[in-house]
């Protein structure tokens, strides 16, 4: 049996990041979004490399429809970006993250 009162738990940080307007410059034209090479926002690749070095779990979030998954994956790969998970088809608009407070005071966000 594990004694959890003496066990040290390392919490891996999770990054949730939107695509359009955050990774790539915003493109309102859906047909261009699906076919054109997207323009990266400055310093995006460097930030992703920093997150990888820190072993963060990266979740891409987007309102892009599921039908654009393959082209979106290719755009991200062609830009030299990597991620652990991608959530597509979210509603347009603000996204709010609500995270818990750990009883021992561990900072989680």
Where are these predicted regions, by residue range?
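HAD-like aspartate-dependent phosphatase fold
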Residues: 1-109
